[in-house]
């Protein structure tokens, strides 16, 4: 037993603690303007979301094994599931999983069987999501095949050829919009994937679903995505939530908890955990997933957000994302950053390095893909632009390498912010 005195400093008063915490937090870099997405987006969160989600009944609640005694919690999950089904155009949704990446991996696990086990993933999907799917598949021994991208979207001809040669494809994961912000050809993808007997998994940005075709309209079998845009702050990467929804024929393979509506002994509306026989606490090692407790508080936030915004409010926010992203892209083009892709996009887009602009002295050299010197110059130029933006309190886009930058615009970005960022870019491009 340790009996010596502990080498601890003297206690601090409350005022001193506040000063110390402010000193520590002052070391953080806080950006006033954000133009970066790549999976986590800076959307406005109505005040009612924090107000409801901070109630102690929700913060401390846990769905016990006798879940039906927690009718309030079950109802919030049921309402969340209902809204996710409406948003995705699917028949059933679960109570959520950890995040968008694990939702995609769980969806891939739903599709595998003894005859079909190969998982196909578009290279135009988010690299972090791809890595999580690969990690899950490594544990189960399922083969993973990457589908090449062409001009920023999934190569349809390559996908059709690969699926025809395989014959054992379990599923194909496509992201809409994809990692580069571009819209995929959903109808053509559905025909190719289902024509090969595979399942179609569509990863979605829930904000984009307010204005784009739903996965259900595209004919997808499973819709997944990260619910962060639905009322979750950026918060250094979490906690977020992964939403999952599926067609009725896949419902019994959904992982995690599903809340259903029924009537109690008095004939009144009641909520229960349904289809529990497929879950790990009953099926044990035969279950397709081991998730049980999930992101229920985050799902509550998403439910409150969707209720507060409504269909019209979400469509308005999504419409602003679309319009402002196009304005900012044009301002960056004027400043000297050339868009890399010409396809339709939602609120994210990629620009090439400033040295690739038409009419620059280095244009011909940069066309030579083998020129390491040119690639290094591009990367340095892109880094210089992002550092200049940071010095102005602006978080620029995500560097993709070789001077390419993935930009994001949401309803939070004002015209003044976009003009200011473009002015900084123009100044730096002139100095390169």
Protein language model annotation of sequence segments:
Residues 1-78:
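N-terminal entrance/gating region of PLP-dependent enzymes' catalytic architecture
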Residues 2, 55-67, 85-89, 115-116, ...:
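Gly-rich Lys/Arg/Thr-decorated short loops/hinges at beta-loop-alpha junctions or inter-strand turns
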Residues 65-69, 85-105:
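Short loop-beta-helix segment that forms the pyridoxal 5′-phosphate
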Residues 230-335, 339-342:
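Active-site C-terminal subdomain of aminotransferase-like
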């Amino acid at each position: 037993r340790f009996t010596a005195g502990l080498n601890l400093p003297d206690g601090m008063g409350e005022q001193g603690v506040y000063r110390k915490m402010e000193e520590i937090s002052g070391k953080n870099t806080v950006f006033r303007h954000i133009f970066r997405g790549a999976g986590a987006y800076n959307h406005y969160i109505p005040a009612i979301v924090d107000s409801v989600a901070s109630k102690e009944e929700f913060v401390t609640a846990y769905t016990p094994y006798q879940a039906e005694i927690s009718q309030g919690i079950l109802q919030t999950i049921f309402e969340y599931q209902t809204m996710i089904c409406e948003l995705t155009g699917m028949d059933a949704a679960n109570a959520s999983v950890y995040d968008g990446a694990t939702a995609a991996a769980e969806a891939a696990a739903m599709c595998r069987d003894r005859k079909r086990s190969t998982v196909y993933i578009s290279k135009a999907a988010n690299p972090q999501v791809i890595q999580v799917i690969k990690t899950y598949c490594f544990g189960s021994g399922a083969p993973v095949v990457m589908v090449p991208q062409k001009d920023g979207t999934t190569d349809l001809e390559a996908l059709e050829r690969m699926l025809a040669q395989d014959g054992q494809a379990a599923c194909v994961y496509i992201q809409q919009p994809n990692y580069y912000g571009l819209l995929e050809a959903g109808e053509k993808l559905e025909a190719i994937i289902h024509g090969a007997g595979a399942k179609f998994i569509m990863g979605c940005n829930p904000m984009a679903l307010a204005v784009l075709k739903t996965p259900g309209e595209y004919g997808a079998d499973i819709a997944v995505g990260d619910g962060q845009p639905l009322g979750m702050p950026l918060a250094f990467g979490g906690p977020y939530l992964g939403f999952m929804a599926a067609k009725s024929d896949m419902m019994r393979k959904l992982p995690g908890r599903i809340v259903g509506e029924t009537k109690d002994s008095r004939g009144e509306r009641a909520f229960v955990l349904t289809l529990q026989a497929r879950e790990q606490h009953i099926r044990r090692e035969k279950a397709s997933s081991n998730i049980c407790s999930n992101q229920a508080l985050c799902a509550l936030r998403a439910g409150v957000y969707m209720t507060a915004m409504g269909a019209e409010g979400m469509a308005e926010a999504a419409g602003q994302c679309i319009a402002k992203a196009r304005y900012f892209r044009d301002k960056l083009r004027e400043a000297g950053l050339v868009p890399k892709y010409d396809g339709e996009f939602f609120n994210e887009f990629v620009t090439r390095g400033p040295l690739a602009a038409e009419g620059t002295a280095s244009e011909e050299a940069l066309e030579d893909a083998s020129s390491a010197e040119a690639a290094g110059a591009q990367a340095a130029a892109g880094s210089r632009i992002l550092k200049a933006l940071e010095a102005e309190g602006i978080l620029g886009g995500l560097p993709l390498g070789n001077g390419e930058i993935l930009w994001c615009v949401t309803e939070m970005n004002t015209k003044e912010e976009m003009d200011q960022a473009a002015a900084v870019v123009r100044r730096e491009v002139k100095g390169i």
